[in-house]
Amino acid sequence: MSKKHPVIAITGSSGAGTSTVKSAFNHIFINVGANPVIIEGDSYHRYNRDEMKRVMEKKERIGNKHFSHFGPEANLFGELEKAFKDYGEKGRCKKRLYLHSDKEARPFGQKAGEFTPWEDVGKDTNLLFYEGLHGGVVDGDIDVAKYVDLLIGVVPVVNLEWIQKIHRDKELRGYSAEATVDTIHRRMWDYINYITPQFSRTHINFQRVPTVDTSNPFIARDIPTLDESFVVVRFRDHKYCDFVYLQDMVHDSFLSRPNTLVVPGGKMGFIMELILREEIEKMLNH
């Protein structure tokens, strides 16, 4: 961990409230004068889009049906750990971008699904901000979580996560529900072993819980809205919260356990800003 060059990581699946999280952190960074290095988790995938497809087909031919972007074989965990460690020690690290679309790729003269070259970043920045699947991952001797000063989990309950995944893949990628269910099956081993353990290492978790029936996520017509949800906020340490203040600020919030605050789903971005702004200010002013 670093007091001079803090590292903040958001860990959670794509679509688990990403737009709300990004909006909240944009507001915080502007308000506290932060100038972050921003690292996206998919830039630390091991393979580009075409390579991943070929490797996955090869793995399936030899009987490995669990190869996925959730696990170590398809990611550069060691390089991610080094980036966090280097930034914490020196305020510098290496970074690249994953180009999701033709629009993103065009300015670089590359194709969608490729990576930009690695570059040295960090000059004139005062924190590193990571958002992706593996901000708190541990795998053997690799311990990414060890170098994170503030680790935040953003994760819906699993049925809601699957509903979001099915709808997102259909709308953005044109995948059938059956194809997405196959992806969920393939990722499950890595999900259990590499994704979920991270949420026990976080300092704060934000978990969205729907108040409508999601018991069969594979036939759900709609994604439950924020207003059809609560957000469960779990704190590992009471130093990150003033429960009396937070309950005064958020109408209809309540404590479900001594370290757990529940707020209406529509207040997810607001509660993030209330809780995290003060912590980030402390880091920058230390």
What are these regions (language model features)?
Residues 21-22, 26:
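Post-Walker A alpha-helix
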Residues 2-8, 125:
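Pre-Walker A (Motif I) flank of P-loop NTPase domains
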Residues 13:
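P-loop (Walker A) phosphate-binding loop of NTP-binding proteins
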Residues 18:
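Conserved lysine of the Walker
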Residues 72-144, 186-199, 209, 213, ...:
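Glycine-rich phosphate-binding loop used to anchor ATP phosphates in small-molecule kinases
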Residues 128, 151-152, 205-206:
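Short, well-ordered beta-strand core segments
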Residues 32-40, 44-104:
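Conserved nucleotide-sensing/catalytic segment adjacent to the nucleotide-binding pocket
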Residues 114-123, 144-146, 158-286:
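C-terminal accessory "lid"/substrate-recognition subdomains
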